[in-house]
Amino acid sequence: MKPTMAILERISKNSQENIDEVFTRLYRYLLRPDIYYVAYQNLYSNKGASTKGILDDTADGFSEEKIKKIIQSLKDGTYYPQPVRRMYIAKKNSKKMRPLGIPTFTDKLIQEAVRIILESIYEPVFEDVSHGFRPQRSCHTALKTIKREFGGARWFVEGDIKGCFDNIDHVTLIGLINLKIKDMKMSQLIYKFLKAGYLENWQYHKTYSGTPQGGILSPLLANIYLHELDKFVLQLKMKFDRESPERITPEYRELHNEIKRISHRLKKLEGEEKAKVLLEYQEKRKRLTTLPCTSQTNKVLKYVRYADDFIISVKGSKEDCQWIKEQLKLFIHNKLKMELSEEKTLITHSSQPARFLGYDIRVRRSGTIKRSGKVKKRTLNGSVELLIPLQDKIRQFIFDKKIAIQKKDSSWFPVHRKYLIRSTDLEIITIYNSELRGICNYYGLASNFNQLNYFAYLMEYSCLKTIASKHKGTLSKTISMFKDGSGSWGIPYEIKQGKQRRYFANFSECKSPYQFTDKISQAPVLYGYARNTLENRLKARCCELCGTSDENTSYEIHHVNKVKNLKGKEKWEMAMIAKQRKTLVVCFHCHRHVIHKHK
């Protein structure tokens, strides 16, 4: 039998080559065992693999028998997803809480299999302007597109849809899926996931709209829904764009001709009179650099979306932006059954920063002239600048994490973090390094990146003060204690290979190199369909703990979240540490009686 992944690669290629193709009989691929090994391989390494839904069902205990039960329930139509367990996490920079839905692991596994099938069809047809929750795309690819393509913009429209993920209309979504996929069983299964409901404080609640945040399928379903918005904006762009031949403005032409006349006069003059005319010549040249060379009759619209956040750049008037905003409002209300937020959908002049994906975006207005060969150019004029919002993002991070306090003169003073004192020295420096690298890596595209140098200083001395406070010592003694011969400081620790030292992260090395010219090709999804290691290990029918090899014995996967948390006291822990794997194929007896000890 041909591997399912090979079939899906062919489907993906067909989807790319024939954009209007409609796909049928996809449900049958959910009745093939090999897709569940791929789904499990994709899921078990995630932190949430051991997080329970409403049932005691996690990545631990996966087996061939479990796959057979899933396939049988899908085949005879008895499968119904369990309600998700509702929990809340804090929103960034807000006191509000974000609802999160935790499905059971069996539901996650089936959702992942459905996601793999849907992705093979939809990924090749999604527009280049969409960057959220897609392979080889990220916040950085969206920002690099803005940097590369938004140059010369005069206005920004910052888009915000009210409660986007909570307000996706189920009937509209299924209708959109049915345009591309003619498979009643697949549509019904997706509808079951949408209508599964949630359990909060052990009370069941129905779901009438939205996709559960935390669900495996939710990001892809949201992209399918918002793909309609992408298509609409690109159609709007075709109507709006007007790139006429640029004509030099009369004011610019008149001043330019006057400068030429003065230049000819200068050749005939001498002495004080020449100096006086030269001064006039320089003043007019300076004024010329501030005038727009051509009439602003061109109209260009550019658009980028990441999940439910989008931004539009407009080369046109403010009235054009208001017209675009009104068109968006009508489309989102009539077609998507959602609302565009009037308060948060802002029209911003490009000389002022517009906020998108945690960056401030603006277009430079520069009168600085640089010589390029024989010609002088305003090299930065009209280029897009990506900036770190230092006051909002970095200042807030420092306050939230209690890294420093602000003195009366507005300067910062690094302090120790009380809540980290019970951690080991190695854990403390690891936390600080992780936070510093995370921020520096995310803001590596910013033109004001070097302003994070002071933030790195605050982080380093807060780390040192935390370790000093832990040991009840002074800052200078702590530095002396952990400094090596090169003058750098780090925390020594020991592993099997010998003694090591973890240094505090070097600020200059935290920034990843980026190329703004990189473009992403729209290619079919390639899975690589050789049988995966996990499938081979399970089908070998050999216990990796006791060595039992019996065709009549059931074999299961034992799963742990982190190998580094294992103490190595038990035989099975030593086996996992030796293999450096989160999974261990064990027989039923070892799993129940040796590892879980009759649990």
Model-derived features: positions:
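Non-catalytic terminal/accessory segments
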Residues: 1-599
